[in-house]
């Protein structure tokens, strides 16, 4: 049993054996950047969360016994889908795509169990909500009112923060790096690089700046966190204390690409001009 952030309990089952034997469902998940760009920059939004969403999908009768697990009192199996199963995410996404067919892209963006609604007016948002509720009712999908937010100007979606100014990095991800001490092992460097990579859209010249840290991961190399690595680490912390706000790309605006090329890395900054000012859209390296 694992404690949830709200204090409730979540039961987890070790399905590593059945997952390793189960063929992978190759149903494609949406591109996160496209979903984020499609959802931001709307006047009114709602964020929806299904009530134990995975458990609202029934298991196929012949597969129920495959989910069996033992307790001190008896053996049990799942009547509904467990989130621990290998193809649970793909199955959930397939269902969402069917439920919201015709709404995705126009009024809704969905990534597995993350759902955001977007509208350009309050009246339109009411109409969109009506369509979404009818679609959910049609398959008897229930929402969790405690985790839903309606009629707001911004919020968090897929680890990004939507505001009237544009797209912000998740403060929790930034704070996780700010709270880190200087790495003392290869594992801690890997953890730092993983967290920086998760924020790569907001960080210019990431590959070039992290190269001294990446070199510490080479096999056979003696670990030595030197002054150069420490200085880079401090600069990342200074930057992430107040990260840049980026905007969604606008198809009717010219995209400018600025390249930074060195012997060690190639980086690019995508910008567009808005109201006479160049605004960052994306950093790639």
What are these regions (language model features)?
Residues 1-285:
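Retroelement reverse transcriptase polymerase core
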């Amino acid at each position: 049993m694992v404690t949830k952030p709200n204090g409730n309990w979540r039961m987890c089952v070790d399905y590593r054996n059945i997952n390793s034997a189960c063929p992978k469902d190759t149903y494609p998940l949406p591109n996160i950047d496209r979903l984020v760009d499609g959802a931001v920059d709307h006047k009114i939004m709602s964020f929806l969360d299904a009530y134990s969403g995975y458990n609202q999908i029934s298991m196929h009768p012949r597969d129920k016994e495959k989910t069996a697990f033992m307790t001190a009192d008896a053996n049990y199996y799942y009547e509904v889908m467990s989130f621990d199963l290998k193809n649970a995410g793909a199955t959930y996404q397939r269902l969402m795509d069917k439920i919201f067919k015709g709404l995705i892209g126009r009024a809704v963006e969905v990534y597995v169990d993350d759902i955001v609604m977007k509208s350009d007016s309050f009246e339109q948002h009411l109409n969109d909500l009506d369509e979404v509720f009818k679609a959910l009712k049609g398959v008897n999908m229930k929402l969790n009112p405690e985790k839903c937010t309606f009629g707001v100007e911004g919020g968090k979606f897929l680890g990004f923060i939507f505001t009237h100014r544009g797209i912000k990095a998740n403060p929790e991800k930034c704070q996780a790096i700010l709270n880190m001490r200087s790495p003392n092992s290869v594992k801690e460097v890997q953890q730092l690089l993983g967290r920086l990579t998760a924020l790569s859209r907001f960080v210019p010249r990431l590959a070039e700046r992290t190269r001294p840290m990446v070199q510490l991961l080479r096999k056979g190399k003696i670990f030595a966190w030197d002054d150069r690595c420490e200085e880079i680490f401090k600069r990342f912390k200074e930057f992430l204390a107040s990260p840049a706000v980026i905007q969604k790309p606008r198809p009717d605006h010219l995209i400018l690409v600025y390249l930074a090329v060195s012997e060690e890395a190639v980086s690019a900054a995508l910008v567009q001009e808005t109201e006479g000012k160049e605004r960052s859209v994306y950093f790639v390296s």
